[in-house]
Each structure stands twice: as C-alpha cells, then as structure tokens.
Amino acid sequence: MSRANKSQCTAVVLSAALMAISLDASAAPQAVQTPTDRNDTVEVTLDRRAPPVAVMIFNKASGGYDTAAPLKWGENSWTCTSATDPAAGACPTEPIWASSSSPTSIKLEFKEETTGATIVLNLEGTKVDVIHINCSDILIPGEIVSPGTAIERYGSWHAVCSPSKNINADGNQLTVKIPTGELKKIPTGGVWKANLVLDLRQRKDTETFPKIAVFKAAIKLDVIDKNNIQIYLPEFTSATPTVDLKLRKLPNGSRMSGTSNVDMCLYDGYNSQSTWFDVSASDGLTVDRRDKGQYSVLLDSDKSGAYESRIDYNVSLTYAGKKIALPNNETVRLQGVNNSAGRSVSLPGISVPVVCTPTPLTLETPEFQSVWKRPGKYSNKLTITFTPSSASL
C-alpha cells in the first residue's frame, strides 16, 4: 500500500471514531455551569475566649462544570495573586501538577478598624473533584470523587463505574476556612477586616493556565473579648485603689468641702465599638438623713452611719464633654459609645494597644461644719459597675 493510501485509511478510521464519540455525547444528558466571578461577604461575631471550630469563607464553592466535556473545567485550580504579600492572601501563584494532598495555607492580613492593629492569620484552603453525571448517565447534584487537596493542584480524578468505564471529574469545589487555632491568635476584641482574592485558573492543552474567574471575599470578624471587659484607672496599679476626697478648710475656717478627680476609662473588650455603656455605683450603705443619691465615708472607729460619724459626697462622670450625675445605686446609660472619642491605652495581658472610652469621675463633698463631725479617719468602699452592650453580643 502506498503512503497516500495508508494516510487515507487512517483518516477514515479517525473520522469513524469521532463520529462515535459525537453520537454518544448527544445521547446523554448534559449539565453546564460556566465559571463566574464571586464577590462574597462574610460577617461573623465571635467571643475571643471561645471561638467557633472554624469560620467558613468559601464552602464548596463551584469552579464550574460541563458533563459533556469534563476536562474543560474539571482540571481547574485556584491560586493567590501573590506568594508573599498577605494583603489579599499569600499562597502559590501558579498551578501545580499532583500537588500535596495537604491543604493550602493562605496567609491573610486582618486589620482592626479602630486601632489599625494588624495580624496575619493562616487560612486553610482545599479543593475536591466532583462529578455531575453518574455511571448510568443520570445527572446528579454533585458527587465528590477525590479527597481534599491543595487548591493549586490541577489534574482530574475519576469515578470507576466498571473495569471498562470511568467518569472523569467535570468540576471542582473550593473550601476556605479560618481554623479555630488561628482565631485564637486575634489579640484583642474589635472589628477585624480582611479581603481575600483567589484566581480561578483553567488548564489548557498547551499547558497554560489562563485566569477565568476571580473569587473575592470581604471578611468582617466582630470579636468580643469578654474576659477583658474592665474599668481602667490609669493613675492606680491596684484594682482597689484608695482615693482621697481632698477635704479642705474654706476661708472662714469653720467649714470644709472637697473635690477629687479620678481618671477612668472603660474598655468594653470591643475597642469601644459598643453602642451603649451602663454604669452604676454604690457604697453599700443604708444611712438615715442622707440626701437621695449621695454616698458616704464612715469614721473608722464608728461605723454606725450617724450624721456626726460620716461625711457625705456626690459622684459624677464626664462623658463626651458632658458632666453626668451618677446617683448611688442607680444606673446611667451612656449612648453612642461607638461614635464618641476613644483613647488608645496598653492594658495588662493584651499584646497590642486597645481603645477605651474616657469617663473621668468627680467626687464632690458639699460644704459642712467641721465641728459637727467627730475627728478621725473616714473611709468606705465605692463600687463601680460597668456593663457594655458588647457583653450581650
């Protein structure tokens, strides 16, 4: 047979094979999902002391599929835009054949909205191969046919129908999550934000990998640090400081009064993102002949509370530039905390600065005749109670 005849015979065989494939495909049902861009929003509120098992960013997100041409998108993969910069996620930037079955570590930078503090967390990314048509040529929702592997891996798994028939995976699904161990690394409460960007890549016969879609996720973590809600008194190192009422004689010499200021800043475990604070104070006393709302200190040698053995005073706080009375055993609600001016402070046990809300106290002792009081040292406890709205989140 001449070379020409051999070529002609080969051409006929190929044509017949192609026709057989075409007829078989047309006989089977077809399902197609074209890969498209994603712009997801993830908002989660969590308690820093007890974070969830994981925060899901993408949960089995489809990279497209075509049951009639399974290898068209069945070998897709996902890559980062940078291998080193965590601003939008750092991980491999090129697809890899037969990559490790281990998840991909995606380094992503989170920034706290109020303080500007940053932290890089390691997200976990996996992909699985799926089929959308079974061995009986029946369309199905999507069956996983591979273990979870690195997201940058390309190549296709298949389902074994019989010794003579396999079904190639026709698509992939992406899962990205923040594991609980990484959530525990967030140093403070507050609003922590990040933006993840992943490119969906298609494998071509030319061994090129064009970008066919972009998967974006705007992530917002509302982190409440309930273990660190506290009243911060910058001037004192003790949790129960001693405050002098600063009683002074007036010019006439027979009367006394006093004013004492205490720097106080309230930390809500949320970088002052609470909508309101409830503040109350109490001296724990039941005293006769005392004006409503007043507090008292008692003579150390006589705790009866008698008029001549006690000194009465008033308490107020300053919030958002306004002086607010704080009556004994009453609760005052401070509104609009998240819109008020905060103060950056360093608190024990917290590795980065946080924002508290300034609410300085003023203890004012009205004028009284000193001769009407017994001489000696006067003292008592003043208990401040602070409850932010963040405590109920």
Question: What does each model-identified segment do?
Answer:
Residues 297-354:
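Outer membrane beta-barrel transmembrane domains
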Residues 22-25:
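N-terminal signal peptide c-region/cleavage motif recognized by signal peptidases
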Residues 99-165:
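A surface-exposed loop-and-adjacent beta-strand signature within N-terminal beta-sandwich domains
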Residues 12, 83-84, 94-95, 138, ...:
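General secretory precursor processing signal
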Residues 27-113, 178-318, 360-377, 381, ...:
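N-terminal small/polar-rich segments of proteins
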Residues 12-20:
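Bacterial N-terminal signal peptides
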Residues 2-12:
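Bacterial N-terminal signal peptides that target proteins for export
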Residues 135-139, 143-195, 201-212, 341-377:
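Exposed beta-sheet edge/beta-hairpin loop segments within beta-rich domains
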